[in-house]
Every structure is written in C-alpha cells, then in structure tokens.
Amino acid sequence: MRSQYCGDVNKSHVGQEVTLVGWVNRSRDLGGVVFLDLRDREGIVQVVYDPDLPEVFDVASTLRSEFCVQVTGLVRARPDSQVNQDMRTGGIEILGKGLTILNSSAPLPINMDKNQHNTEEQRLKYRYLDLRRPEMADRIVFRSKVTSAVRRFLDDSGFLDIETPILTKATPEGARDYLVPSRTYKGQFFALPQSPQLFKQLLMMSGFDRYYQIVKCFRDEDLRADRQPEFTQIDIETSFMSSEQVMAKTEEMVRGLFNDLLNVDLGEFPKMTFAEAMRRFGSDKPDLRNPLELIDIADIVKEVEFAVFNGPANDPEGRVAVLSIPGGAKLSRKQLDEYAKYVTIYGAKGLAWMKVNDLDQGMEGIQSPVLKFLSEDVVKALLDRTGAQTGDLILFGADKANIVAEAMGALRLKAGEDFDLLQGEWKPLWVVDFPMFERTSDGGLHAMHHPFTAPTGISPEQLEADPTAAISDAYDMVLNGCELGGGSVRIHNSEMQSAVFRILGIEEEEANEKFGFLLEALRYGTPPHAGLAFGLDRIIMLMTGASSIRDVMAFPKTTTAACPLTNAPGFANPAQLIELGIEVIENQESKEEQA
C-alpha cells in the first residue's frame, strides 16, 4: 500500500512518484490550495493538492485530523523560502495526484497538538491516539532500536537468549508479589516473578554459561515516576567471570548504546565505593553532574555549646555535615524555611544555615541563627573547611549518620537544580563494595541487594561471626543519579548460602521449604557465577529525556496501578472464583465506595 514511510522521503526522491499511507496530522485550505501534513511512525511530510485535479481536490477538502489515508504524488523540492528546518522532510513536499480515504475519524477525545495539555488519565485512556503523537512514537521506535542493539551485542558476545517461567514461586525480594491462584491446587498460588534471579542461577548450574533475557518482571509496590507494577529488565548472568569482567562487558554494551544511538561518548566509567558515595554525596546513586558535596565538620563542632551540633558530633553513630552553596546567600528567610521543611521529609528535625554576606568583615559579615553558639575560631574553621566565599550559603545537617546522609543528599540534589549547578550532560559511574547487610528498623538484618549475593573474601564462619562487617561483591551502574542496573557475584556453595539465610533469620525449615531446590542444586558442582540486571524502561527514559517511564512504555499503568484503557483490574466472574476456591472478603471501605 506504500512505497516508503512519510518520514523517509527526502531530496533523493525528487521527481519520483511515491505512495504513502498515514494519518492526517493537520489539513488547511490556503487560497484554494489544500496543504496536508501526513504522519506515520517515522515522521511527517507535507502534501499539496491544487484544483487542477478537481475530484482529488474535493476529497482533500473534506479531510480532518486523524483520518487514515493513502496518498500518491510526485516528490518536489520546496523553494528555499519555504524550507522548514524543523522537519526532517522540510526540504521537499509531495504534489498530490491521488487520494484514498482508508478510514475517517470521529471527533477526537484528546488534543493531538504537542503544545496542548491532556491529563495523564486522558492520555492513558486513549493511549492508541496518544501513541500517534510524534514525540511518543519516536520514543517507542527508539525503544525498539535499543532492544535490537542489546540483542545484537549479547548475541555477538556468546550469550544465549533463554526464557524463564512467569508462573513461579514467591521469593523474598523486598516487594509484595502478584499472586495467581491455582485451579488444580486449591488454596495454593503462583507468584509472578519480581526477577528471574533464581532461574538464571539455575541456568548457570545447567551449564549455559552466558544467559540473557529481555523479560517482564512484576512488583506490587507503591509507585513513583520511575516505578511500574510490570516493568522490563535486561537480565544477564554469566559463569566463570569475575565482577570486574561482568562490569567491563556490560559497560561496553551501555557505552555502545549511547555511541550508536545518541552519538555520545560516555568514556570510561569511574568506580566509587558505597562508603565514599554516602560520605561525599549522601546517596549510593550520586548524580556527578552536581558539584556540591557533603563536608564533614564533626571534629570542628565537638566542643561547641550547642547540643544540636555537639550531640551528633560526639555520637559514634552520629554525623554533622554541611553543604556549601555558591551564591546561596541571596536566599530569603522564606526560601530557607522551605529548605528546612524539605529535609523533614527525610527524617531531619530541622536545618541550620549560615550566610557569608561579606568575608572581609569577619564575624560581622556572617549571618546565622546559630552564630551565637559558635566562636570565631569555629566559624573560621568552618569557612576554611568549606572554602565558602562572599555570597555563599552553608547548610548544616546534624543527626544520626543515615538521616544526615539521606536528608542532606536529597537537599544537595534540590539545591543543584535550584541554583542551576548541573555540569555536563552525562556522568556515569560504578558504585561498588556495598555492605552485605543493613539494619532494619527493628534491629534485625536485611540483605542490601538480595540474599544470593556473595561476600568478598571471607568464609561462612567469618561471615556469621561479624555479618555487619562483610562487604558484598556487588556493583551498581549509575547515570545522572539514576541506577541503570545492579548486580553481583552470586553465592555458589550451599554452606555460604545457608549461613546467609541464618543471618537473615531464615531458619533451616523455612529455608528448605522456600529454597530447598536451590540448596540442593548448589551441591552438584555449581560454577562461580555473576550477573546484572538493567531496568530497560529507565534506560530509555534517560536516553530520550522523558520525565517518566510511563512515557517510554506503550501501555503503562497509572500511579495507582490501574489501566484506564481496559479498566483493569476488574472484578472476577463469580463462577471463576468458585472454580478457584476463592471467596472475596469485602472491607468496610469497599462497601462504602459501592454504596
């Protein structure tokens, strides 16, 4: 039905007859000539109909937005004065000779102009229309190019594309599972996988030493801009490769994607330990475009007569750190109060500040509500430590170390945006040497990555003797403050795996019930293996500049995990529930909603 895509017509086709199909993006009658912008997934081209062909012209005059049409015409160059530099096809146009309406369109329920706003609910309800818009179509096409490039790279590197089950068993991976009832085993449930973690490890045990899969995963968790209940991973696992080799191979893949698809050279990725990232940036996924760093000052304020500072400064689990913001002294008291309110979201009790109004005036040039608690020597030491200059602002965080890191790390990002401090377009890095475990709110231990991650260089006995000192052989790839992917060397013997389960409070009976198949498999010559999983949606979001992963998925869910297009989720047929042996118990809230 067509000779090429609309967006592919160019000056090399001048003088040729082409046949195109697509949708009417815009139609206008200017002085007896109809100008038609025809759109398909590859772009937009201008078609011109004049009255010399009255039958065709009359049909063209009836066209409205989103009519689906077939066009035949002659490609001609536009006059220099009419060239549209904003269009890929802006140097040519089609002189229309034929026109067939393949389908008309009802009045549109959403606005297709990119400059007009539609609510997200409207966009998702009429997603098939929303996806016709060039910015959305471009992202979906780009996504396909990324997955094709990933497959080519991994295929060429000897990896095998192997599918793993979707109906599987619940595993403790940090989020709630989506459960699927079994009809044949009444009262029992499958779980949709949060990742193919255990199956890809079993594939290593099966001898398939290089595996990958572009796979759907499911997590029933609270949603944010970068979260969806179903999402796509680039899942990779290898045998007989060290963490350094896995990082090198996957870095090569990502650098290739950016180079081939965006013409961007990311360069070699620097490595940073978890401890350094938390100390300098308050985050294990630091945005290195932001030049601000957390500066420790506990040693300076240990002796001050101000409990807010000296308490955490003398507490082994406390921390006192500052951010020095160039030009920040111009902030009003109201703006500083907003910053103070902002850090309370992350557990901080408040935010002290100091303005350096005039460095040459000594203490007279310093303004701060806590200045009365600080001696001139302390203030001088603070200024020396931070390198603050006239016009700068110093913000203080003092609390437990984890609260200071989280609150000041978040404030660092906010200040970087507010003061337009971000430098460079792309700043990748590897974060390595994570702790094996972290403390939970009830004082227990939780695996920082997952319970199948191997520690670095210790025995099971040493691990159990001091689990909080253990460092995992894990690594995260971070770009512009977003975690692109994370992975680790896996535990490959049953003694170490059992030790980790015991540390996590998983007793032998529970371990055998949930992971008996894994512990059994580990007894039969399991090779050393390691892997990594990338969040495909997040990679596409970053590469296309989208503000949400919902804008790079064809049919995403809302932030409440619903689909306005299909009205999913919905109520099940009572007969199906009976067959499954399920009874729905209504809570008071749902009864009130139905009333």
Curated annotation (Swiss-Prot):
It is found in: Cytoplasm. Signal peptide: none annotated. Its main location: cytoplasm. Keywords: Aminoacyl-tRNA synthetase, ATP-binding, Cytoplasm, Ligase, Nucleotide-binding, Protein biosynthesis. Residues 197-200 are annotated as: Aspartate. InterPro entries: Aa-tRNA-synt_II, aa-tRNA-synth_II, aa-tRNA-synth_II/BPL/LPL, Asp-tRNA-ligase_1, Asp-tRNA-ligase_1_N, Asp/Asn-tRNA-synth_IIb, AspRS_core, GAD-like_sf. The keyword Mitochondrion does not apply. It catalyses: tRNA(Asp) + L-aspartate + ATP = L-aspartyl-tRNA(Asp) + AMP + diphosphate. L-aspartate binds at residues 173, 219, 449, 490. It is an enzyme of class 6 (ligase). Its EC number is 6.1.1.12. One of its GO terms (cellular component) is cytoplasm. ATP binds at residues 219-221, 228, 483, 535-538. Belongs to the class-II aminoacyl-tRNA synthetase family. Type 1 subfamily. Catalyzes the attachment of L-aspartate to tRNA(Asp) in a two-step reaction: L-aspartate is first activated by ATP to form Asp-AMP and then transferred to the acceptor end of tRNA(Asp). PANTHER family: ASPARTATE--TRNA LIGASE, MITOCHONDRIAL (PTHR22594:SF5), ASPARTYL/LYSYL-TRNA SYNTHETASE (PTHR22594). Homodimer. This is Aspartate--tRNA ligase. The lineage of its organism: Bacteria, Pseudomonadati, Pseudomonadota, Gammaproteobacteria, Alteromonadales.
